Amino acid sequence: MSDRQQVTNAKGERIAIVAGLRTPFAKQATAFHGVSALDMGKMVVNELLARSELDPKLIEQLVYGQVVQMPAAPNIAREIVLGTGMNVSTDAYSVTRACATSFQSAVNVAESIMTGNIEIGIAGGADSSSVLPIGVSKKLAHALVDLNKARSFGQKLQIFRRLGIKDLLPVPPAVAEYSTGLSMGQTAEQMAKTYNISRADQDALAHRSHTLASETWASGHLRDEVMVAHVPPYKQFIDRDNNIRENSVLESYAKLRPAFDKQHGTVTAANSTPLTDGASAIILMSEGRAKALGYQPIGYIKSYAFSAIDVWQDMLMGPSYATPLALKRAGMELEDLTLIEMHEAFAAQTLANMQMFASKKFAEEKLGRNRAIGEIDMSKFNVLGGSLAYGHPFAATGTRLITQVCRELKRRGGGTGLTTACAAGGLGVAMILEVE
């Protein structure tokens, strides 16, 4: 059996990425304060359809994701269909795979095209860290259920008497792993210590990311892939990411205190991604359908792979497990790639993965390979800056990476690009894109 992955339909047509778009990414409680993930999702899909001059009625499937779920709209994909002029019969469902969510939505739509069930679909994701589902304590939740069954005033009073003041306090969404109690930042700190990644190296990577992102915006390269977002009450707009440190100065990073290990830590707010609001989406078609409609695809999906590892140690090492799978399925080696784009959740996590890419010992002991994945050529790596600068709305990052890599490869005259990300739960993803 061949190891090669056939990302084509029954006619042998490739899966085309016709267009991609995102909102600007904004730090928590800034430009998108009060704007839900659903509203941002509708905003970007509407604009993507308008810019592409694609009739919404032609969309056969929409798969969309959200990590921080809103109880009022649990199926964000269906609500986007109803809010963007598509047929009410359009197939729509929601997915979640932590920070790899919109990679998952893209793969789901691609596989629907591969099987011949559809020819045109939209994939993406959105998250808001400003509009959050604030919960209640377990004791209060239990009491509220009991209140529904209470008949008399006395019964209701007895239920309330079981509650203390602390039981009435709101409960924000969890930031830790359910199974371990560890946060992403604590895991990044563990990886920094395990792999001897210095504070100086983390700060240097963050500085590089912000500098390149600032230069990329100044060059105008992102104007066609980032929309102008007008937000209620429509007296202002946001047209660029607001986390990027313009005129970044490396020395200033050293001033920040460690965020997760106050005494001996090296992970800080400056070398980590901030809580971010934003949305992104891509249009996928069969190659033949794209040609028939007159579209020039920005890229094609060549291969993809997901991985899962233990959550107690090195939980954010997903790229080092998923990448060799995607490369093998594409019949490629790391050195064959034109560009390499790795999601920078934390500088420590990124540097640890880069270290493992180059490690023969890791390849032999963890991957069952007789050679390392490969040393990363920094002239190919995150050439426009990364998530440390742009920010990270959890479900939106995947399709941001896909669009950004395809468009940058197009500017360079074509080639192949790797997009890869870690995700909560010990998950990882890698996707190889090709551009003509």
Swiss-Prot record:
Keyword Transferase: yes
Taxonomy, superkingdom: Bacteria
Catalytic activity, reaction form: an acyl-CoA + acetyl-CoA = a 3-oxoacyl-CoA + CoA
EC number: 2.3.1.16
One GO BP: fatty acid beta-oxidation
Keyword tags: Acyltransferase, Cytoplasm, Fatty acid metabolism, Lipid degradation, Lipid metabolism, Transferase
Group of enzyme by EC: transferase
GO CC terms of this entry: cytosol
Free-text function comment from the UniProt entry: Catalyzes the final step of fatty acid oxidation in which acetyl-CoA is released and the CoA ester of a fatty acid two carbons shorter is formed.
Name of protein: 3-ketoacyl-CoA thiolase
